[in-house]
Amino acid sequence: MTHTPRTPLRIVTYNIHRSRGMDRRTRPERVAEVLRHVDADVIALQEVLGAGPSGTSHIEEIGAALGMGWVMAATRHLRGHLFGNAILSRFPAKHHTQHDLSWKACEERCLQRVDVDVNGRVLHVYNVHLGTAILERRYQAQRLATIVADRHVTGPKIVLGDFNEWMRGLTTTLLSAKLKSVDLGQYLRRRRTYPGLFPILHLDHIYYDGPLEIDYIEVLRTRLALVASDHLPLIADIRI
């Protein structure tokens, strides 16, 4: 039997903090330059500003600078702008949906899913930004795990984003029981991603399921990445 060789892909998750850097300057073009250096095929962003009354949309500017298509999943309005998650891709997006993860009176959150057609194979990309409260994250992690486990959604799945958990807590334990977790310690000596300039916490994570292989993991620490946002990009080279 002849097996079709797996397709290599570079994926990145990056909380861009409304394009506001550690120097308190709002520069979406700086975020785009960081991502241009990463040279990823699929990009999952959190804390993204979309269209607003001024017509200035950070995701439009970043997408145009990178020459990539994009889909936004807004959770609320911030100063008149759409605000939430966004996925950019060099490959066609076949399907897009978002699931509400909001809990009680906490800030609105969502799980964004985009199905990307990679040379005839579908990769399900889940982009998430969990809350800061422990009980909130527990609810969100349980709901996330249930959504990703949907048996009607088959094929390789990758779940990545800002999980707002910096040690092996309840959320990490719950998700690791349902999904495969990328052991960053296997690839990285320094795996902390927050805050950008002097990272002391590891908030960004990658989980996956199905026929998918992880080849390489990197936290980008270029001079520009250290100031462009309060997070550092977490990069994964995979094969599907």
Question: Where would I find each of the regions flagged by the language model?
Answer:
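Active-site regions of metal-assisted phosphoester/phosphodiester hydrolases
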Residues: M1-V42, A64-A65, G69-I240
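Active-site neighborhood of divalent metal-dependent phosphoester/pyrophosphate hydrolases
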Residues: S19, Q46-G52
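Short Gly/Thr/Asp-enriched flexible loops that form oxyanion-binding sites at enzyme active sites
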Residues: S57-E60
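Short active-site-adjacent helix-start/loop capping segments
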Residues: A51-S54, R79-H81
